Amino acid sequence: MLYLEDYLEMIEQLPMDLRDRFTEMREMDLQVQNAMDQLEQRVGEFFMNAKKNKPEWREEQMASIKKDYFKALEDADEKVQLANQIYDLVDRHLRKLDQELAKFKMELEADNAGITEILERRSLELDTPSQPVNNHHVHSHSSGEKRKHIPSSHHSTTDHVPEKKFKSEALLSTLTSDASKENTAGCRTNLSSSSTNNVYNVNSSQPLTSYNISSLSTGAAAGAITMAAAQAVQATAQMKEGRRTSSLKASYEAFKNTDLLGISLSRDSASYSSSALASTLTQTLTSSATTDSRSGRKSKSNNKSASQQSSSSSSSSSLSSCSSSSALAHELSHQQTAAIPESDTNSQVDWTYDPNEPRYCICNQVSYGEMVGCDNQDCPIEWFHYGCVGLSEAPKGKWYCPQCTAAMKRRGSRHK
């Protein structure tokens, strides 16, 4: 995993080598320019004095001027060769970097399948300028925190850490794989301990994001989706009991329509996401139900029958919470499974193109496949892909691009 250190050590001398070669190329360029200026002056003097001197002198001067021209041409060729050597040097280091990145990607994929695509997308999101944030979801941040994104919570207790490593590890955090067993166990525990205040205190004091954090080997995309949905349900659980049912549906609709940082689900993590989400939703709703029952018992501590009624209502709330979370998880599973083909299609990102490679054609893409050149010497684009200009084979005779053709027609109509 020391690819970065090895590569940095390899290119340590590259800046000095490039500086020396560019300096040498600049000196050769000045030498050629000075030689050309002197030759132009000699040619002018030669033609001025040609009629006054003998033919032998003219031939001698002509041969000397030609010799100096050939020498300047050789220096110019050497300068071009030096530029090609510099290009090959940089290109060789770029190819080496691509190879090292490919090896590092293979190691990451071996440990966590599909993690490289998530990290690449996250890196692109961090490099793109931040968009205006909705005030209903996230408080306004300072310019130093523009790159931090909080999914859908009104309250933020996470300190800003700019390192990508921390954010990547946060994406790797997932919930337990056996969520269905924990879902049932959570319901039973809530029913059996409805009269114990210590259990209520523990459940209500733990933050939602601390539930069921397990190993990094499971799907990171499923963990991110589960965390976002759980935070939405946590905000719902804090509302009044009369508004909780309708607001839970609204929270689910808002979660379903959210892009969730652009992370696409893989087929392997879809089923896992639904089960882990069921476990998290169960614990959240169970915690809210027990909190309501605790407040009810606290206000009626002197009435024994009222306390028993509160305990029974807590049990019924727990049962309804478990059934609601299971139904919501089942519905989410269907939504995720239906969205998998589209997300797989849209998530195909080509990472092989060099960002410094020239762009051509009206599509502003790199050179690939068969291309045709515009015969207009002043064409700003010059090269076009066959498919972009509606060609299936090489055109016969001269060919002009649509822009140049339209410009020529406009000039022709003006002359008429």
Swiss-Prot record:
Annotated site (Histone H3K4me3 binding): 360, 371, 375, 383
Q: Name one Pfam family in it.
A: ING
Does the record carry Plastid as a key word? no
Residue ranges annotated as compositionally biased, kind Basic residues, are 136-152
Bias (Low complexity) occurs at 189-198, 283-293, 302-319
According to the lineage, what is the superkingdom? Eukaryota
Question: Where is there biased composition of kind Polar residues?
Answer: 177-187
Question: Entry's InterPro entries?
Answer: ING3_PHD, ING_fam, ING_N_histone-binding, Zinc_finger_PHD-type_CS, Znf_FYVE_PHD, Znf_PHD, Znf_PHD-finger, Znf_RING/FYVE/PHD
Q: Where is this region: Disordered?
A: 126-165, 177-198, 283-319
GO BP annotation list = chromatin remodeling
Q: Which UniProt keywords apply?
A: Chromatin regulator, Growth regulation, Metal-binding, Nucleus, Transcription, Transcription regulation, Zinc, Zinc-finger
Q: What does this protein do?
A: Component of the NuA4 histone acetyltransferase (HAT) complex which is involved in transcriptional activation of select genes principally by acetylation of nucleosomal histone H4 and H2A. This modification may both alter nucleosome - DNA interactions and promote interaction of the modified histones with other proteins which positively regulate transcription. NuA4 may also play a direct role in DNA repair when directly recruited to sites of DNA damage.
- Quaternary state and partners of this protein? Interacts with H3K4me3 and to a lesser extent with H3K4me2. Component of the NuA4 histone acetyltransferase complex.
Instruction: State what protein this is by name.
Output: Inhibitor of growth protein 3
